[in-house]
Regions:
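Asp-based, Mg2+/Mn2+-dependent phosphohydrolase catalytic module
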Residues: 8-31, 38-227
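Conserved phosphate-coupling serine/threonine residues in phosphotransfer and NTP-handling enzymes
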Residues: 4-6
């Protein structure tokens, strides 16, 4: 199962990229932070709760399909601000978030990743907007995605694997590896992405294993190591 902070529109490119690399994957193999957020919101709030979503139309549609009430624009009855990865971000959306947060609305974010990797380097992700809104309002959200354990727990629930049978592989200590640690499962920190070895000490999160890349992970599994 691939744990992605992106909405369905975002993980389709990931699906295509894996296919290009010869990795067989299907859309159902991806579990997003939006999936975990929907589960959390359904369990915490009443069915008639109105949400103001600062996110893409794809995210809003996913919430609507799950039966949640999403406001089209800023409304007085919006009880919860949900912040997600938003490639359609506008100043009007930020202002609406500030208005609701200053009024005391509940505040939830799908994930805390500061940047999103792109072909030209890094671009702001949900975590960067979290910091911007914190500067403006002093508020911090309840974060649902990694590093919280919900996504890993949901993946195990859907696949039927136990914690002893599960390992989380990722390139970010502060989200991926922390999620696995918080869920009580083994982790593999790969150094072929954003993270570097110094991040282990920086964030105080210890992975079970460290490997250079996914190829080393596959070679290790083929050899039957590590024990």
């Amino acid at each position: 199962v691939r744990l992605s902070p992106l909405s369905p529109a975002g993980y389709c490119p990931l699906h295509r990229e894996e296919a290009r690399l010869g990795i067989e994957a299907f859309p159902d193999d991806f579990l997003t932070s939006a999936d975990a957020a929907i589960r959390y919101l359904r369990g915490r709030y009443l069915p008639d709760t109105v949400y103001y979503v600062c996110g893409t139309e794809s995210l809003k549609n996913q919430l609507r399909l799950a039966g949640l009430r999403v406001a089209e624009t800023l409304r007085d009855d919006c009880a919860v601000v949900l912040l997600g990865y938003d490639t359609e971000l506008t100043y009007e959306k930020l202002e609406s978030c500030c208005i609701l947060l200053n009024r005391g609305a509940d505040y939830v974010a799908t994930h805390p990743d500061l940047v999103c990797p792109t072909w030209y380097g890094s671009a702001p992700d949900c975590g960067s907007v979290i910091e911007m809104l914190h500067t403006a309002t002093g508020r911090r959200p309840k974060v649902i995605g990694k590093p919280q354990p919900e996504m890993a727990l949901l993946a195990m629930e859907q696949t039927g694997f136990s914690p002893r049978e599960t390992c989380l592989i990722g390139d970010r200590v502060y989200t991926d590896i922390a999620c696995g640690v918080n869920a009580g499962i083994d982790t593999i920190f790969v150094l072929s992405g954003e993270g570097v070895m110094d991040d282990i000490e920086k964030y105080g999160v210890q992975p079970t294993y460290c490997m250079q890349n996914i190829r080393e992970v596959l070679n290790t599994l083929e050899k039957g190591e590590p024990k």
